[in-house]
Design a protein with these regions (language model features):
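Classical eukaryotic N-terminal signal peptides for Sec-dependent ER targeting/secretion
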Residues: 1-10
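Secreted/periplasmic proteins
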Residues: 10, 15-195
Length: 195
């Protein structure tokens, strides 16, 4: 009886901390920018880093301005259909059977990721389902990223906001959610101390 009770508590705790899955899939991971390694794998990311991301549609925000290698691009058609559903949401990626704990978040659209069959298991540079990453992140997911140019992945986009864009948090400052919460929490503690 005691073991059943403990098992029930464990299941309850696990479900309480899991987030709802918004989207999931399998396909290919590629890279298209890098903030930290602007020159990597025989590529210069200078121009890509200046491009505006799809999720900050109203005010324009470049990859350089976001200043994070954790931004991920997903199927352009899907994200364009409802920016608020996907922008800033956490992405959990699995490569080589290992689930990443990197704080990845959706921030851009990927044209290649929205074409090709979702059931296709053969790489096609003109259209294959998947996600687009920074070079640094893709290299961390798989050390063959530079040599191969793409890796096999699976992913889940979960209902946890890691970054606020003008499309998913209108009227709020753009930026990492946890950083802003930390600032707000420090401000609240300072206010309480003054009372």
């Amino acid at each position: 009886m005691k073991n059943q009770f403990l098992a029930s508590i464990g299941l309850f705790a696990a479900s309480a901390f899991s987030q709802a899955v918004i989207d999931s899939g399998t396909g290919f991971g590629t890279y298209y920018y890098d903030i930290e390694q602007v020159e990597a794998c025989g590529t210069s990311f200078d121009n890509q880093n200046l491009g505006f991301v799809e999720c900050n549609f109203f005010t324009g925000l470049s990859l350089d301005q976001i200043n994070s290698n954790y931004l991920v691009a997903m199927n352009h058609t899907q994200i364009a259909g409802n920016l608020a559903d996907y922008c800033g949401k956490r992405v959990i990626v699995t490569a080589n059977g290992v689930q990443s704990d990197l704080p990845l978040f959706i921030g851009d659209g990927c044209q290649r990721c929205g074409t090709g069959s979702k059931t296709n298991t053969v790489w096609n540079p003109n259209g294959a389902p998947g996600l687009d990453f920074s070079y640094s992140v893709l290299s961390e997911l798989n050390s063959n990223a530079c040599f191969a140019g793409h890796i096999d992945i699976s992913w889940e986009i979960v209902d946890e906001t890691l970054y606020d864009f003008d499309t998913n948090a209108p009227g709020q400052p753009t930026g990492p959610v946890n950083q802003r919460r930390s600032v707000n929490q420090r401000s609240e503690r300072a206010t309480r101390r003054r009372r």
